[in-house]
Every structure is written in structure tokens, then in C-alpha cells.
């Protein structure tokens, strides 16, 4: 179960804004719920921010001058990119622009195995090729040693980047990065491709007219893919880019849009994030990032289609590899359930593809709601890890705590990476536990609803009005609404039982909602039950007729008290870690015989159920999550059920003989703890 937070709009401000603009009340409720209570700021958000003068970014004028001089002299220029979607799109834009200027131009992107950023081997190779000027895109801000070598080899260097600068900047003719402390540009949140886009505008004399028409579509893809805030200038870039993307002249993008079965009349940032960007990223994860660049640059239809097919195949491999790693993790957790008792998960495996461990880490965070470090071990005993966390637990500081074991690490509060010797993984795991387990309060993944949706809010005009907030993305997510006390009238299986549709009543409103990836027989509800749901609203069009679509993001039976759930879950994990708790508490969570009988009877009746669903069905004042989990552990100890901790699935097992629950490992352990606590 995930934690919910339901925000409240400001009804006074909503009413005030409705008198000043033609936005719908539901849209204004969302905006005021997100803290936008000043009308000028509201107007700026929907009007879109004009792109500021590219020359406001520190060193932009110098960069343009150096590059223009190299173009005029026909010096060999190399664009040095990065292997992710942001780096690929940055490379594509700048290469295409300089080629159109008649430059003597090439590009270089390191393979993932070489690591992020500049490397000495590549620099030596570029010098041998006769490169006179290196222009980095989406990297370079930390390349202090590499920059010195470039100077020694009598090459010039222009750095364009958007990552946080170190204290010491590299030696370069120009360093174009909005995050420089001395950069006067007011907008700081550009992706690497946004910086490259502005460099092209600077090379064009400062005008955005040509570069917007030629590159806004590619720039939008890189911006969405890099998950930078879709506010301010980024919002403007993506909005314009989506307009151009529908009729793009880039052959590779046209094939990709068609093969991904995207509707050209309804292209949005979600389509980029889930259908286009992952395919481009797959080339850097499993093949060569050069394939993605060639896809975007190719002017030959046959070549472009072949490149797209290659990318799609690589993306299929990526998905398969993710699934294989997830299966290994599930098997490990089922064999070692104590893994889940810790506040931060550390999981490692030999041969796990390091190109996907970041994605796996994100999936683990979403599923278990816990910060985690996923580590891949190679044949030489070297290990590389990727981590994801939640706001409130700084994974970078955790890495600092473990720094003595790490060869290299970096990141920020919610994400990071590391490398170490495989022999140190066990020590690292213990140090992570020592750092995180004792924390008094620990954050959890939280789903945020913009408002409690009332029946009268649900109408076509209101739902259609939400489109004004697009494009959605980081810091401007698609609106999410809470619906509390929804009565289930009918349950309908979809796609051979893979998904579920419900017909429901919500006050005076009668509607349908879709719950993806939930088989009806695995639902926590039945006809007649009341549900609380978090939903996204949209518009379906069929035979030119519009209707409201409701997609359920999360749901639970009405009446569940989430604070009690999470407090009891935390206590259970403390117990399993062996932390000493008061004797009075331990007594309360040891189930009575009658409580054990009641839980067992329910399980034997339903046969298969998840622990969370069981909690929602039978929890009460005396049966909290901690006590319920202990009941399940007791039954598992005695072979009365099969319990798979990785998925929390409980399956009834027909007993072969009578068992004595009193001598179960779990009860023995609890009684020992009770004795130590001073019975």
C-alpha cells in the first residue's frame, strides 16, 4: 500500500481567477492546489515564457565566436556527446546545424562501457584524427584533467553542459552552463539539449526563428527524456516541439512515431516519455548510441527505417533484460525475506546489465516504496551500482557515509551511482543498514492528489479544460484526483483478464474506470464494496463522440487508516531487525488463539490473497498490520500457507496434520524478545 496525500485547492482564489480568465474551475482548482495563487504567475504559466536571449548565458558569445572562427577556417570540429537521449539529441542538433553551415564536422559519443563524460583515450584518438576544436554537449563540466590534456595537444575546447559545476572549472575557451555561479541567465533548468539549442540560436545571431522550426521537435524529446522541470522556457520548448513533431521532416522520427503506433493528432509529452525516449535510450544501453544519432540524421528512407528497427529491437532486449533482473530480485527476496525488513534495499547480481540497473532501481522504488541500491558485478570482480531514493532520505549522503568502500560515487538526494570492488558489497550493505535503519522518522513514497474530486466536477468541459496545463512532466505532472467512497456496481475483465474495468456510482455520478495490470480475481474489492481511488481523467473519442475516461492509479477499500498502517509496518520491520521494543508493545502484537483462528479461516476460504488485501479485509482496532503479518509468519512457519514475501502473496495449503502454533519460530522469537524486554 502506498501513502496518499490529498491537497486542497483555494476556493476563494479559484473563484477570483474564474472572473479573470476562461479556464475551467477544475483546472484552476489544480493550479491553486499546487500553490499558484497569484494571477500574474498563473497567466505567465499558460501564456508560456518567451525564450530569453541566448547570449545571457555566460560565455555564450565567446563559444559562438570560437565555433564560427573554426567553421570559417574549415578546422575539423568534433561534437563530443553523451550516450543518453539528452546527449544524443544534443549531438544531433548541433551536428546538423554546423553541417548546414558548411563546417568540417564530426561527432563522437563514448559507449556506455567507457563511462559518462570525456575520457583520455577518446581525446588522444580525436587528436590523431586532426580535430582542432572539441565542443561538448550534455557533459564536460567536470572534465578538469581531460581539459588539460586537450590543451597540451593544441586543441581548443568549448564546453556546453547543464550539470552542476564543481568548485574548479575545466580549462576551456568557453564554458556554457546556466548553473555557473557567475551566469546571469535567469532560467537555469535547461536540459543539455536546451543548452545546445540555445548555442545554435547564438550561432544564428541570437534569433530562435530558424532553430525553432528545424530543431524544436528534437529538443522537446531530449528535454522530456532528461526529466528536467517542464516549467518556464522548457515548457515553451516542449510545447512548440510537440507542434512540430506531428509533422516532423525527420525521417527516423516519422518511422518511430508510426511503428510506436502513436496518434499524430494527439502527440504529447507522455508519448515522448514512454514511447519515444526509451527507444532512443536503448541504443546507449544495449547497442551503440551512434545508431540513435544516425536515426535522427539519416536522409535515406531505407536506412532510416532500418535504424529505427534496430532501435526497437534493442528496446525489446532492454525490456527482456529488465524482466530477467527483476525475476532474480524477486527470487532472492523470497529466499531472503529479511531483505525487506531494512529501510534501504541493497541488491546485487553477477552479470546484471549495467545499462538497465537504473531503470530496475526505479521499479524497485515504485513497487516496494523503499530507497535502494542495485549493483551489477562483472567477471573481473568490479561492481557498478545505481540508486534511487525519496525526498527526505539523501542517497548521496548515504554514499558519503560509505565512502571508504567506494572507488567512485556521485549523485544527489534522490538518485546516485557508485563503483566498488565486488568483495566490498557485503560491507557496503551493512554500512547502508547502519546509516539508515536507526533513523527515527523515515520518508516513504507518496502519491499526491491535487484535490478531492466531487461528483459535480466530473463533466466533459472540466476534463477537456485540463489539457490547457499540458505538456505534463517534472514539476508539472498530469493532475491526479481522489475519489472517496466510490461504490462498485460491476466488475468487467478486459484483455483476457489482464486488466479490470469497473462500473461505479459516486454520489449522483455514474461512470466507468479502468485499472490496468489488475486481474479481477486479484482485486481487493467485490461488487457492492466502497473504494477510495486516485485517478487521472481524460477524453476518449470514438465515432466522433467524446466521453470521459477515468484511469485508476491506486485504490484501496474505503476506511483504511493509512497512518496506522505505516506505523504498524515500521514496527514490524523493527521487530524483524531485532530492535528492542517495549514489553507492553510486544504483548499487544502477539496474536491470541482466537485471532489466529479468525485470520486462518479467512485465508482458507479465499485460498489466495495478498497481505495488503488481507489487511484491508480484516484489520480492525485490535488487528493492525504488524499483528497480521505476525499471524501470516506463524502460518508460514508451520506450513499452513505458502507466503512469497517479494510479492506478499499468500496461498492456502491444505494441512496434512494438526500443528502446534505455539512452537512456531516467530512466536518463540517474540517470547524471547518479551523476556529480554522485562516481561
What residues fall within each predicted segment?
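Short, glycine/acidic-enriched loop or turn micro-motifs at the edges of active sites
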Residues: 85, 141, 164-165, 180, ...
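Hydrophobic helix-and-loop "lid/oligomerization" segment in the mid-to-C-terminal part
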Residues: 2, 7-133, 152-154, 204-427, ...
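Short gly/pro/ser/thr-enriched loop/turn and capping motifs at secondary-structure boundaries
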Residues: 114-115, 143, 163-168, 182-184, ...
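Acidic-glycine-rich active-site phosphate/pyrophosphate-binding loop
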Residues: 164-177, 504-509
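Generic beta-sheet signal
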Residues: 108, 137, 160-162, 176-178, ...
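Short alpha-helices
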Residues: 93, 170-224, 593-595, 599
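Intrinsically disordered, low-complexity regulatory tails of plant transcription factors
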Residues: 143-144, 226
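Acidic, two-metal ion nucleic-acid-processing modules in DNA metabolism proteins
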Residues: 94, 99, 235-332, 388-395, ...
Amino acid at each position: 500500500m502506498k501513502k496518499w496525500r490529498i491537497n486542497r485547492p483555494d476556493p476563494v482564489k479559484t473563484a477570483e481567477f474564474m472572473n479573470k480568465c476562461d479556464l475551467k474551475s477544475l483546472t484552476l482548482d489544480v493550479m491553486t492546489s499546487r500553490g499558484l495563487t497569484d494571477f500574474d504567475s498563473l497567466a505567465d504559466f499558460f501564456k508560456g515564457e518567451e525564450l530569453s536571449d541566448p547570449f545571457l548565458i555566460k560565455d555564450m558569445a565567446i563559444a559562438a565566436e570560437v565555433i564560427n572562427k573554426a567553421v570559417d577556417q574549415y578546422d575539423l570540429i568534433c561534437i563530443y556527446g553523451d550516450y543518453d537521449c539528452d546527449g544524443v539529441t544534443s549531438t544531433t542538433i548541433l551536428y546538423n546545424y554546423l553541417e548546414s553551415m558548411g563546417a568540417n564536422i564530426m561527432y563522437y559519443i563514448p559507449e556506455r562501457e567507457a563511462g559518462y563524460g570525456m575520457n583520455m583515450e577518446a581525446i588522444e584518438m580525436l587528436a590523431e584524427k586532426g580535430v582542432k576544436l572539441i565542443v561538448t554537449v550534455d557533459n564536460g563540466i567536470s572534465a578538469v584533467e581531460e581539459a588539460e590534456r586537450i590543451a597540451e595537444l593544441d586543441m581548443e575546447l568549448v564546453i556546453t553542459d547543464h550539470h552542476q559545476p564543481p568548485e574548479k572549472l575545466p580549462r576551456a575557451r568557453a564554458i556554457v552552463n546556466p548553473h555557473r555561479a557567475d551566469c546571469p541567465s535567469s532560467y537555469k533548468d535547461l536540459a543539455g539539449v536546451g543548452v545546445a539549442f540555445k548555442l545554435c540560436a547564438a550561432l544564428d545571431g541570437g534569433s530562435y526563428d530558424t532553430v525553432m522550426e528545424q530543431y524544436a521537435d528534437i529538443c522537446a524529446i531530449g528535454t522530456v527524456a532528461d526529466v528536467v522541470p517542464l516549467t518556464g522556457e522548457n515548457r515553451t520548448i516542449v510545447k512548440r516541439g510537440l507542434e512540430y513533431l506531428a509533422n516532423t521532416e525527420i525521417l527516423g522520427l516519422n518511422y518511430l512515431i508510426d511503428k510506436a503506433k502513436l496518434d499524430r493528432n494527439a502527440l504529447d509529452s507522455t508519448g515522448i516519455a514512454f514511447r519515444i525516449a526509451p527507444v532512443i535510450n536503448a541504443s546507449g544501453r544495449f547497442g551503440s548510441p551512434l545508431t540513435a544519432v544516425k536515426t535522427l540524421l539519416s536522409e535515406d528512407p531505407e536506412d532510416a527505417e532500418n535504424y529505427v528497427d534496430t532501435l526497437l529491437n534493442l528496446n525489446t532486449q532492454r525490456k527482456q533484460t529488465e524482466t530477467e533482473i527483476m525475476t532474480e530480485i524477486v527470487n532472492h527476496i523470497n529466499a531472503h525475506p529479511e531483505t525487506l525488513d531494512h529501510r534501504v534495499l541493497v541488491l546485487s547480481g553477477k552479470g546484471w546489465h549495467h545499462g538497465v540497473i537504473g531503470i530496475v532501481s526505479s521499479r524497485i522504488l515504485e513497487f516496494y516504496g523503499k530507497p535502494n541500491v542495485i549493483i551489477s558485478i562483472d567477471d573481473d570482480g568490479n561492481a557498478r551500482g545505481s540508486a534511487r531514493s525519496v525526498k527526505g532520505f539523501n542517497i548521496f549522503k548515504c554514499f558519503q557515509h560509505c565512502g571508504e568502500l567506494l572507488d567512485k560515487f556521485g549523485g544527489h538526494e534522490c538518485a546516485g551511482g557508485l563503483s566498488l570492488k565486488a568483495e566490498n558489497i557485503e560491507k557496503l550493505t551493512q554500512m547502508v543498514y547502519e546509516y539508515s535503519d536507526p533513523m527515527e522518522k523515515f520518508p516513504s513514497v507518496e502519491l499526491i492528489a491535487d484535490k478531492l474530486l466531487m461528483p459535480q466536477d466530473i463533466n466533459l468541459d472540466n476534463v477537456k479544460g485540463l489539457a490547457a496545463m499540458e505538456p505534463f512532466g517534472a514539476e508539472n505532472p498530469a493532475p491526479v484526483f481522489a475519489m472517496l467512497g466510490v461504490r462498485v456496481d460491476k466488475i468487467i475483465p478486459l484483455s483476457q483478464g489482464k486488466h479490470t474495468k469497473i462500473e461505479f456510482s459516486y454520489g449522483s455520478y455514474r461512470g466507468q474506470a479502468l485499472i490496468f495490470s489488475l486481474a479481477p480475481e486479484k482485486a481487493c474489492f467485490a461488487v457492492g464494496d466502497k473504494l477510495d481511488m486516485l485517478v487521472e481523467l481524460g477524453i476518449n473519442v470514438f465515432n466522433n463522440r467524446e466521453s470521459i475516461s477515468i484511469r485508476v492509479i491506486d485504490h484501496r477499500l474505503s476506511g483504511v487508516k493509512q497512518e496506522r498502517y505505516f506505523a504498524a509496518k515500521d514496527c514490524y520491520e523493527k521487530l524483524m531487525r531485532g530492535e528492542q521494543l517495549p514489553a507492553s508493545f510486544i504483548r499487544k502484537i502477539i496474536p491470541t488463539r482466537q485471532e489466529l483462528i479468525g485470520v486462518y479461516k479467512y485465508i482458507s476460504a479465499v485460498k489466495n490473497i495478498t497481505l495488503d488485501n488481507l489487511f484491508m479485509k480484516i484489520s480492525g482496532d485490535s488487528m493492525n498490520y504488524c499483528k497480521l503479518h505476525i499471524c501470516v509468519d506463524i502460518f508460514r512457519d508451520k506450513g499452513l500457507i505458502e507466503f512469497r514475501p517479494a510479492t506478499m502473496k499468500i496461498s492456502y495449503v491444505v494441512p496434512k496434520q494438526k500443528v502446534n502454533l505455539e512452537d512456531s519460530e516467530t512466536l518463540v522469537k517474540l517470547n524471547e524478545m518479551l523476556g529480554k524486554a522485562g516481561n
